[in-house]
């Protein structure tokens, strides 16, 4: 897959505001502050396309980006962030369950795991949720540049042991771009 253009389309806080299902959607999911926005910016080559923050929980809406005029990248709120109210967590949970569970246009869910803390309980719960809804998914181990080779090997093995249904596992660095071409090649298989 080659990305020639990318643009922000809209943010959605209610399922009734989702765009028409006219293009396939690749959804980016993961814990808060795992690097979803950085990954989107790295993949598209557009540094400020998705807003990044060092503060967890900044993405609170479903954000749509149109790529090549025929594909959506969708950035969804991170899970596992403790500093929001229970009511807000419940609202996010209902929004995401409705979106991921029912949206026919979803071609692939890309589950991002911090390679320094792979396969935490919340990540395993998300894998179970995706399997329950029969959603194809792949895993991206983010922040690869922060690990030694030994730590990378351990992170990949730990992830493989609990991600039996994942279509792929890619180690990725948004800083260096390591893993970018491999990940884009995987996307082609689902479109």
Curated annotation (Swiss-Prot):
PROSITE patterns: G_ENGB
Keywords, ordered alphabetically: Cell cycle, Cell division, GTP-binding, Magnesium, Metal-binding, Nucleotide-binding, Septation
A single BP term in Gene Ontology: division septum assembly
Cofactor: Mg(2+)
Signal peptide (from-to): none
Superkingdom of source: Bacteria
Coiled coil: none
Residues binding GTP, per UniProt: 30-37, 57-61, 75-78, 142-145, 172-174
Domain EngB-type G: 22-191
A Pfam match: MMR_HSR1
GO annotation, cellular component aspect: cytosol
Cross-referenced InterPro entries: G_ENGB_dom, GTP-bd, GTP-bd_ribosome_bio_YsxC, P-loop_NTPase
Residues binding Mg(2+), per UniProt: 37, 59
Disulfide linkage: none
GO MF annotations, alphabetized: GTP binding; metal ion binding
Assigned protein family: Belongs to the TRAFAC class TrmE-Era-EngA-EngB-Septin-like GTPase superfamily. EngB GTPase family.
Biological role: Necessary for normal cell division and for the maintenance of normal septation.
NCBIfam families: GTPase_YsxC
Protein name listed in UniProt: Probable GTP-binding protein EngB
